[in-house]
From Swiss-Prot:
Keywords: DNA-binding, Metal-binding, Nucleus, Repeat, Transcription, Transcription regulation, Zinc, Zinc-finger. Signal peptide: none annotated. The keyword Membrane does not apply. GO terms for cellular component: nucleus. It is found in: Nucleus. Belongs to the krueppel C2H2-type zinc-finger protein family. This is Zinc finger protein 287. Residues 49-131 form the SCAN box domain. The gene is ZNF287.
Amino acid sequence: MLASSKRMNSSSRSQILLRWKSDKAQSGPYNVEKEILTSRFLRDTETCRQNFRNFPYPDLAGPRKALSQLRELCLKWLRPEIHSKEQILELLVLEQFLTILPGEVRTWVKSQYPESSEEAVTLVEDLTQILEEEAPQNSTLSQDTPEEDPRGKHAFQTGWLNDLVTKESMTFKDVAVDITQEDWELMRPVQKELYKTVTLQNYWNMVSLGLTVYRPTVIPILEEPWMVIKEILEGPSPEWETKAQACTPVEDMSKLTKEETQTIKLEDSYDYDDRLERRATGGFWKIHTNERGFSLKSALSQEYDPTEECLSKYDIYRNNFEKHSNLIVQFDTQLDNKTSVYNEGRATFNHVSYGIVHRKILPGEKPYKCNVCGKKFRKYPSLLKHQSTHAKEKSYECEECGKEFRHISSLIAHQRMHTGEKPYECHQCGKAFSQRAHLTIHQRIHTGEKPYKCDDCGKDFSQRAHLTIHQRTHTGEKPYKCLECGKTFSHSSSLINHQRVHTGEKPYICNECGKTFSQSTHLLQHQKIHTGKKPYKCNECWKVFSQSTYLIRHQRIHSGEKCYKCNECGKAFAHSSTLIQHQTTHTGEKSYICNICGKAFSQSANLTQHHRTHTGEKPYKCSVCGKAFSQSVHLTQHQRIHNGEKPFKCNICGKAYRQGANLTQHQRIHTGEKPYKCNECGKAFIYSSSLNQHQRTHTGERPYKCNECDKDFSQRTCLIQHQRIHTGEKPYACRICGKTFTQSTNLIQHQRVHTGAKHRN
């Protein structure tokens, strides 16, 4: 016995035991009526399976037609158009497993409607353990095991199962509801409809429980989709008068009628129905169905009877017909029964010809309506099956949180969330799970098994849900739609995350700093800031990252991959964010505006960085020298001065740089690319800064001003060199003679004195 059953809590145990005892202790009409009241009906798949398994060979149709019908029934059951091979295999295994179970256990397990063989096994295991523990108090569930039984404990565990195989199954007559004709006449239309419903539900419940049931002929009549629209009252019939002349006077006809019709059981009506059906030739008094009917006229005119037998047969046949027609008709029909009159040795009947005018259900018409959800159906059995889904919904309630479940096994699995119980343990790594299905999925990590394959691209998956999600990449299906903005998503989780944009909900809270997040993944990424954990390592340069996405982006530096391409100019980028930034150069859009100076930016990150120029905030500090920076990228670039790291290397000449932008600019030396062009004179430049400086020659702009002498300059470097005149700073020193200079160009010229190099004009 699995640990799950051993550690089952008392709430689950009591619910299973109560269900088992109530089903086992009650038999006959009460048990089935209880099932009716709770509407524990068979699912559509089970009905299709029964139709397939119990399909009779039609002699008149021939073998080819029979094979075609059988194939159609099989397709309705297995549904290969929506089920995978694994799902069809699961249906077959579940069917065979339920077949080999002992009778009463099979009945009980079926009544729980397991959706998989794994769920059915769990039900049997849980029930087995409970009954073993209850065995000392309940002698009806098990027998005393002999002391010298060679089978030992196993015999005790399985003995109660074997005993159940010999139990006798009930028949349809055992559950038939008996009523008298007098009771029927006193019933209201709603009660008559209920009686019809109960009769059909009794039959379908016995089929759903796997019992061998001979189909009474009244069942297909009750299931026929037709309605009575009117009845025709006729006068005396000459044919009836002729037949009535053969009957001699009767002193007390009412006595005969009462005796014959005192108690008419449902199964008796089946016998009369069989007789009438065998003697039917059509014509006078007929119930119309799709395939057959029976005639009272033909039945009464077959042979001559004495008066008493003639009249009593008439009443009995009439009463049974009234019973059938009242069971069938869906609307309350008032039947005007005119009394038989005997006059001077002749029987003249002013009879009612129940000439019920029927019409077939029109195409598309659905006369049967569900009282719960309002859904309509063409056939009554379809309504019964549908109503079972409402009754089966949420039958088991969790005592901890009040949540309801359809199946007891689902409740047991749910309660492990409250208890923290994880009875299913992986033998490979020791990880434990609350459900066996989760363990099965986990074990595929160790085995490498990926049983679910995409038919389009051949990619394999370990879980069916992952395959379903993947297939949407091929179909483009996005079934999850936001009701606020209409945006659609391929995953339900993506829709949930998106909806938090509208609601502003941030349910994930960091325990360290209290910061909230709308997605759990964002919280996990944030928590790595506090822990300092960087589990993702680059195999090329051994750099570590806190997030896998950062590592993927970094690896594109080594591979040179640029998978994001601009549709306007064809330029490619390694990161999607860089492409988005680039696209703003084509649109000119600058939607982020500074509230202080009014300057506009194309990206929110640029606006955030700009704000720091007003506030003076420098949140990024170097741990080595203490220097602070307003941007994290500037800190990263600065730290490379201390560690000497130059991760950006030119593939042509091997020169390395601390910044990727410097490498990009350097590579233009090899390619000769000059992407920055002056609109005034057409001159092109390698660097954007060079273009900016050049354009000032056309505009005359001199934005850099000396605070000492108010002299203006077009370039910042020129201002820096000029300011050294005021400060006397000479940062460039000769290594040979120690002479210092204010500009690097002056130092280069001086060094030629020592080297003997001549300046080129």
